[in-house]
Amino acid sequence: MQYKEVAGGICAPKGFAAAGVHCGIRANHSEKYDLALIKAEVRCAAAGVYTTNKVCGAPIKVDRAHLTDGYAQAIVVNSGNANTCAANGVALAEECCALVGKALNIDEKDVLPASTGVIGQPMVIDPFARGIPAAAEKLAATAQGSTDAATAIMTTDTHKKEYAIQFELGGKVCTVGAIGKGSGMIAPNMATMLAFYTTDAAVSPALLEKALKTVVPGTYNQMSVDLDTSTNDTLIIMASGLAGNPEICEENADYAAFVAALTAIAEHMCAEHAGDGEGATHLITCEVTHAPDLKTARAVSRSVVCSNLFKAAVFGRDANWGRILCAIGYTPGDFSIDKV
């Protein structure tokens, strides 16, 4: 399938605007953006996947509740405070949604919150009460709007992460855009990262969720930097349907093409996350061929890229390929090491 890379990030698809502002969540960073807002013109099919950590951030609990009907219209994200292990965390996340709902004149239940930053720190509503109206006023359906939002969600990242591609569905040009953050606490099974996708493809909520959960295991769940899985990992997608393609309501050729496009953009974003790992000087990718099944292939690649011994060899430019065999050897699964 052919894809065309386009500018605009999450604002490249039809029907989306974004903004980033400084509102004071990062008290010691007087100018740094720390609040992002993404808004859709229409109520969108939406889906999300989240951390596997048993300790999860309060925004994730709110997201799960708000996404029970499969629809959303806005996303609000802060950096600098994870809103995790705070006594008032869920109430504060809900209050943020109410502020967004009021500022955008939409149902607060159609707002999805996300947070990233320090775990266990107190959090108050005052910065949000200032920042959300300011972000709503600044919303722009432009490349700059996407860039500002991508910048606002950064923590230890060294650069912003955004991408967009176009492809064809049902004779219509469709676009998928993404922004993300995360360079530390990254391990298999989603790890310290936030990612927000927008698309103008028309996809039913059920098929959008299925597509997302099909893509994540082979992309985000295979990514590793330091083997720490965060409490706040979140990947959310909203689909406006404004491209005008026939709505994808069954697993047909258009569905397969949509999954392929999502996979392509997810692979690009994962490379951005891993390549920007805290202290990283190399980006390692592992391709497994002739495995007996997909489960084994993923397990082998995960063992290799997670091996600290192998990472040390790569860092030291030491061609110690025995460390690869060692990592393969302790992988669960039935395969012949003699064929490696």
Indicate residue ranges for each PLM-predicted region.
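A structural signal for small-residue-enriched, beta-sheet-centric alpha/beta enzyme cores
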Residues: 1-91, 95, 101-340
